[in-house]
Every structure is written in structure tokens, then in C-alpha cells.
Amino acid sequence: LNDYPEMIEGNLSHNAGKALSLTNLHWGLHGWAIYSSLGLCFAYASYNKKKAFRVSSLLGPSVENNAPLAASIDIIAILTTVIGIATSLGLGASQINGGLDYVFNIKINEFIIIVFITILGLISVCLGLDLGIKRLSQLNMFIAVGLLLLILILGPTIFILNAMVQNAGLYLNQFIQLSTWTEAYNNSVYQNGYTLFYFTWWFAWAPFVSLFIARISYGRSIKEFVIGVLFVPSLIVFIWMGVFGNAAIYQVLNNIGDIGAAVSSNASTALFVLYDSMILTKVLSIISLILIVTFFVTSSDSGDLCRDT
């Protein structure tokens, strides 16, 4: 929050509330609205209008009947998919490397980590949608729920639950304000450095995530689709960020550990620094490393499937 104009130096409780509101802005309804709206367009065009699963199919006959233009648009969509996944793989490799170094004092070239994740993704894709991608995704969610419950139980449980209720109120109260804030009266660089970065990332992932969502949503009504793609993921993100975010904030407010310094110096190790003040530190770290790998493998799988389409 160093670049955020409404930060009050020394007022940790105020800044903590703002931090979670901005986190929910960057990872909540706004981002999933991008996926749900584009995914609904893909689903309607493909299942109701019998068009191909391509971005160009959404732009009307004038584009569809112009083969060079349609091909150019589809190529751009593929390139944005590759760039979006590459950015995520790079950040994921950095966190995996940081975790291995911090917890086990093992240093691995990040390129090797990316190659390893890519190979796992290719194996999963070759096994098919049901045998590979579906089962890996189910394993991924099982591990994620288990880790979330462990942090909630091992961390400051009452504080986390109380804070999440307050976070919900702050987010809903500031929803319109945050959605329309353009820094018109500030000379800060927060929006360019954070909000625009996150939303650009959402848009880069939009073609393949939306197409993937449409492919697995056959037979759903529009109402079911919107609930399942917009509201359910946003709620899951709110819970996830609330549990992990407030566990970290509790440590900062009570001068426990060095997570604040870790975020400032090397953000890739911050998650593992959080675990230092909990029991089962090594277990939590190992589970997190496995989860990071499976998250990025499933993301790569989805991208590969949609690029093939």
C-alpha cells in the first residue's frame, strides 16, 4: 500500500481494511465478470448458434466471412493466451524457487521449474479431459481446501472470522467507489502499478479461460452459468484471501514474525514466512509448493486445450 493515496502511515488497522478491499477488487467480482461475460458469449454462439469455438465467431458475419481477418483475430487471441500463461508461469516459478530456497535451502533455475510444469501439463493433456485434466483439477481443489482449513485452524481463527465479516462490509460499502476510481485528483501511481496490471492480466487470460468455461458448461442455463462462473468463484476468492490475508495481517498487527519485511524484500517468500509462526511449518510449506505446481499445471492444461480448439 506504499503507493496508495489513502494510506495513513502508522494506522495499521485502517490500512489493513483498505488492503483487503483492494485485494477483493483485484481478484473478485470484476475479474470474474470478464470471464463470465465472454464465456457466456462463447457458449451461446457455439451451442445455440452452432458456431466454432473461436474468438472470431463472436464478431459477426462480416468478420467470419473474411478469412484473413478472422484468422488474424484468432492468432491475436492465441498470443494473448500464451503471454498470459507465460506471465503466470514466470511468477509461479519465482514463488516455487523462493519457497524451495527459503524452506529447504534448495536453489533451482526457474527455467527448469517452468519446463517441469510444462511437461506435467503435457502429460495431463495427453491423458484427456476426463482422465487427466479433470482428476488433476479435483486433486488441486482437495489440496486447496485442506490447506485453507489448516490455516484457519492453526492461525488466529476468531480474528480471521471477525475480520472477514468486516472485510465484507468494507468491500460492499466501497464497491462503487473502487470500481470508478480513476485517480483524477491524485498524482499517485497506484492504479497504473496495480489495478491496471491485474486487470490486464485478467484480459490476457480471458480468451482461453472463457472458452474453457464455455466448453465445460454444456447443458447449463444462463442463470446457472452466471452463478457458477461469477458469484461462486468470487466467494471462494473472498474466503481464500480473507483467511490468508488476515492471518498475515494478524502477525503484522501483533509484531509476530517478519512477514512485512518479507513482502518488501522478496514477496515470493512471504507465504513461507507466514508459516514460520505456526506449527507444522514444514508440512504447510510442502503442501503449498505442491499446490502452486498443480495450480499452474491445470492452468497450462486449460490453455493447451483451448489453443488446440
What residues fall within each predicted segment?
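Short alpha-helical interface patches
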Residues: 56-60, 223-224, 229
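Transmembrane-helix bundle segments that line or gate the permeation/cavity pathway
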Residues: 1-98, 102, 155, 159
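Transmembrane alpha-helical segments in integral membrane proteins
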Residues: 28-54, 125-128, 203-222, 287-308
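Membrane-embedded translocation segments of transport machinery
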Residues: 67-69, 77-220, 227, 232-286
